[in-house]
Structure formats: structure tokens, C-alpha cells
Amino acid sequence: MATNQFANRTRQTLAWITTCGERVRSWYEDYRFGSIDENAQLGRRGEQAAAQLLRRKGLNVIAESESDRAGEIDLIALRKRPRLIVFVEVKTLSTTRPGHPADRVDENKQARITRAALRYLKRKKLLGITCRFDVVAVWWPRDEPRPTRVEHYESAFNAVGVDSFYG
């Protein structure tokens, strides 16, 4: 009888420790990589999930939703060694329609991102630094607290209208 009570008490203690461990891990990940605002619109939540992924990969997210008259860049990240600026377009899909979120980054969108990136580099006096254009695809079904899938495509496209980088 005493061993049965001991076994039950041990199971309860382990369950409590596991629950506490999950809470601590969740808190630490939010602290370390950024949290997701569950009240934000879908696109914004997708950008937050993408920023978490980039931080996990060792990139430093230096700007979010950077925009000017040339267009908007969802995320701008920096890799320190070797020095590289990464311009990231995030596409979030909430439905079960066929198709890939990244397919929505067509040539017109690429051109707008390229122009906005050039203006950003000129404005910050960073024209000599290597840059890359990435796409992050996020699948986030309706009524789900977290995305079901997040994929990062490095060097997803080259600068469109490259001569404008030097004009």
C-alpha cells in the first residue's frame, strides 16, 4: 500500500515538474527569440513567427515592416560574420487552398522589394555590404495558436532590375 502511494506521488511530482519545465521553456523561447502576439492580424503573426525562426538560425533581426515610397520589406536581418544583410519577404497562408505561400512572390513583388532594399541601403549608407533576398513561407490555419509549418528559403530570388542598384 505504501509503495503504491509513493508511486502515485512520484507520478504527480513528475507531471508537475514536466508542466513547469514546459512553461519555463516556453517563457525562455519567447524571451530569447521573441513572442507572437496572438491578437495581431495574420500577416503580422506570420512575420513574428518568421523573425523567431531567423533568430534561431543566428540572424539578428534589425528591422520589421520597413517601408518607404518604394515599397515595404517585411524583415531585415543581419549576419555578422561574414557580414551580410538579408531582406526577407514573409508570406502567410491561412487556408487549405492548394498552392505554396512563396509562389505569391512574383516578379513584380520582387522588383518592389529590390527597389525598397536599394533605398534602404542608400539611406543607411550600406551600399558596399553584400545582401541576399529570402522568402519565409508560413502555414497558419485559422483558429490555431501557432503555425503548423514555417519554411525559410535562402537566396529565393536575385535583385530584379539590378542596374538600378548602381544607377
From Swiss-Prot:
One of its GO terms (molecular function) is nucleic acid binding. Disulfide bonds: none annotated. InterPro entries: Restrct_endonuc-II-like, tRNA_endonuc-like_dom_sf, UPF0102_YraN-like. PANTHER family: UPF0102 PROTEIN YRAN (PTHR34039:SF1). Belongs to the UPF0102 family. NCBIfam families: YraN family protein (TIGR00252). HAMAP family: UPF0102. This is UPF0102 protein RB9115. It comes from Rhodopirellula baltica (strain DSM 10527 / NCIMB 13988 / SH1).
